[in-house]
UniProtKB/Swiss-Prot annotation:
<comment type="function">
    <text>NDH-1 shuttles electrons from NADH, via FMN and iron-sulfur (Fe-S) centers, to quinones in the respiratory chain. The immediate electron acceptor for the enzyme in this species is believed to be ubiquinone. Couples the redox reaction to proton translocation (for every two electrons transferred, four hydrogen ions are translocated across the cytoplasmic membrane), and thus conserves the redox energy in a proton gradient.</text>
</comment>
<protein>
    <recommendedName>
        <fullName>NADH-quinone oxidoreductase subunit B 1</fullName>
        <ecNumber>7.1.1.-</ecNumber>
    </recommendedName>
</protein>
<dbReference type="InterPro" id="IPR006138">
    <property type="entry name" value="NADH_UQ_OxRdtase_20Kd_su"/>
</dbReference>
<keyword id="KW-1278">Translocase</keyword>
<dbReference type="GO" id="GO:0005886">
    <property type="term" value="C:plasma membrane"/>
</dbReference>
<feature type="binding site">
    <location>
        <position position="47"/>
    </location>
    <ligand>
        <name>[4Fe-4S] cluster</name>
    </ligand>
</feature>
<feature type="binding site">
    <location>
        <position position="48"/>
    </location>
    <ligand>
        <name>[4Fe-4S] cluster</name>
    </ligand>
</feature>
<feature type="binding site">
    <location>
        <position position="142"/>
    </location>
    <ligand>
        <name>[4Fe-4S] cluster</name>
    </ligand>
</feature>
<keyword id="KW-0830">Ubiquinone</keyword>
<feature type="binding site">
    <location>
        <position position="113"/>
    </location>
    <ligand>
        <name>[4Fe-4S] cluster</name>
    </ligand>
</feature>
<keyword id="KW-0472">Membrane</keyword>
<keyword id="KW-0004">4Fe-4S</keyword>
<keyword id="KW-0997">Cell inner membrane</keyword>
<dbReference type="GO" id="GO:0009060">
    <property type="term" value="P:aerobic respiration"/>
</dbReference>
<dbReference type="GO" id="GO:0045271">
    <property type="term" value="C:respiratory chain complex I"/>
</dbReference>
<dbReference type="Pfam" id="PF01058">
    <property type="entry name" value="Oxidored_q6"/>
</dbReference>
<keyword id="KW-0411">Iron-sulfur</keyword>
Length: 194
């Protein structure tokens, strides 16, 4: 008997039969399948929609994460992308859409406005979608880069595989062009030029 982990849930290989067979927990297998079959419903309200369209383009290839085809009926979706600012008038519609989604359902806040209200600090704007519906992953940025959104999608997939429902925030990647080591290397190269 041995432990096998081949990109999916933890399985046990049972020996004793001629060909052997593998067993796993049913919930681990279902979570592994769910994380690669996310049916998204985009709720796009503001300027982050442009980055959403860029992220959905072939350059960033959401298809490799199993979330490429948007559903435009909440009853067929299990991942709600909240993209942009939510006003007080839009909040009841957002809540209704969330309630119509199939269980289990996940929510990804796309951008600073969806995460915390952004720079709109007035009575007409909801200060973060978690005031209206529960949120699983927050992707900060104004607008967030497509790479950060894909990091958020991968973080959500990890949470689904673990069965974790606690909120998570995507941490920004360190840009090599802005690190001090990179700047020191550039300065040395400039000094060595004639």
């Amino acid at each position: 008997m041995g432990e096998v982990k081949a990109g999916g849930p933890s399985t046990r290989v049972m020996e004793g039969s001629e060909h052997g067979f593998a067993t796993t927990r049913v919930d681990a297998l279902l979570n592994w399948a769910k994380k690669y079959s996310l049916f998204q419903y985009p709720f796009v309200t503001a300027c982050c929609g442009m980055e959403y369209m860029a992220m959905a383009s072939p350059r960033f290839d959401m298809a490799r994460f199993g979330a490429e085809v948007p559903r435009f009926s909440p009853r067929q979706a299990d991942l709600l992308w909240v993209v942009g600012t939510i006003s007080q008038r839009q909040a009841p519609a957002l809540k209704r859409i969330y309630e119509q989604m199939a269980d289990p359902k996940w929510v990804l806040a796309f951008g600073t406005c969806a995460s915390c209200g952004g720079f709109y600090d007035n009575y007409t704007t909801v200060a973060g979608i978690d005031k209206v519906i529960p949120c699983d992953v927050y992707v900060p940025g104004c607008p967030p880069r497509p790479e950060a959104v894909l990091d958020g999608l991968m973080l959500l997939q990890d949470k689904i595989a673990r069965g974790d429902r606690t909120p998570a925030i995507v941490k920004p990647r360190e840009d090599p062009a802005q690190t001090t080591e990179h700047l020191v290397t550039l300065q040395r190269k400039e000094r060595s030029l004639p």
